[in-house]
């Protein structure tokens, strides 16, 4: 990862950056290298000041490799921001998450990602693909997936080198002027081009498909007496019951029927 990113970013670290690995996620959550608590959904962390990468082994070589690549992108982002070419960490902290996290996802999973493709298909089906400005201002749009998809489009059309140039420029002038200066287009025009490309890719797949509500009845949801998180469903042999794990009780996850 380091050699690949060093070539792409045209940037080398002046000194090695520590990578702190934990045997599993529970050990990672108990790290004393960070203040505060880490949630189960946190896959890894890169410190902004020391640029240390802190992460667990996931039990899957592929997943661990992805998290390591993702966090090393952040290490490069921080290091560039702190150098002469950047504007300090303040410039980085002003950038939207779709730009920072989306770049880390794109450069660590590549242009064709099945998970991101699933998000895009669903957004097209619901006619809810965000614009760049919506991703910047509305938290309901997950920046990792939609940001990765946008960067994949930019990388495919303009080249990955332009992604790096856009990031560097964004540190100094902000993301919107950087799009105009580096790509020669506006954020609105880029949003329209991205939407057109996504629709061309996924709209043909929507033919003959039904929305979930048209295909069956919703069984496990707050509206039916279940919780917000309901996992591991198992149907009884006679089809009358569904056993599942749910957090609908206040203090614990229990088996429900």
Cite the ranges covered by each PLM segment:
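Surface-exposed helix-capping loop/turn segments at secondary-structure junctions
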Residues: 7-15, 156, 160-162, 219-221
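Juxtacatalytic substrate-recognition/specificity segment
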Residues: 1-96, 113-115, 133-135, 175
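Short amphipathic alpha-helical interaction/hinge segments
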Residues: 30, 80, 115, 119, ...
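Aromatic-acidic/polar surface patches that form glycan- and anion
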Residues: 61-65, 97, 140-144, 228
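Active-site-proximal alpha-helical
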Residues: 2-5, 98-99, 103-113, 121-188
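Beta/coil-rich, acidic/histidine-enriched accessory regions frequently appended to metallopeptidases
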Residues: 138-142, 165-257
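Residue-level detector of short, conserved catalytic/binding motifs and their immediate flanks
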Residues: 17, 102, 240
């Amino acid at each position: 990862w380091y050699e690949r990113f060093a070539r792409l970013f045209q940037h080398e670290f002046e000194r090695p950056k520590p990578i702190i690995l934990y045997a599993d996620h529970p050990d990672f959550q108990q790290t004393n290298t960070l203040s505060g608590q880490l949630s189960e959904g946190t896959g890894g962390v890169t410190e902004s000041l020391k640029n240390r990468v802190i992460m667990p082994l996931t039990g899957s070589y592929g997943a661990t490799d992805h998290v390591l690549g993702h966090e090393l992108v952040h290490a490069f982002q921080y290091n560039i921001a702190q150098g002469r070419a950047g504007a300090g960490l303040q410039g980085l902290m002003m950038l939207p998450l779709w730009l920072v996290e989306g770049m880390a996802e794109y450069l660590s999973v590549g242009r064709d990602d099945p998970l991101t493709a699933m998000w895009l298909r669903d957004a097209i089906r619901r006619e809810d693909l965000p614009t760049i400005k919506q991703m910047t201002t509305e938290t309901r749009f997950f920046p990792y997936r939609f940001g990765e998809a946008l960067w994949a489009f930019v990388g495919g059309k303009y080249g990955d080198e332009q992604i790096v140039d856009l990031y560097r420029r964004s540190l100094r002038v902000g993301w919107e002027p950087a799009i105009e200066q580096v790509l020669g287009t506006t954020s609105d025009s880029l949003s329209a081009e991205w939407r057109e490309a996504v629709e061309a890719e996924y709209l043909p797949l929507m033919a003959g498909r039904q929305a979930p509500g048209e295909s069956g009845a919703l069984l496990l949801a707050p509206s039916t007496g279940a919780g917000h998180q309901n996992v591991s469903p198992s149907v009884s042999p006679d089809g009358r019951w569904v056993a599942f794990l749910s957090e609908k009780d206040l203090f614990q996850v229990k088996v429900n029927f």
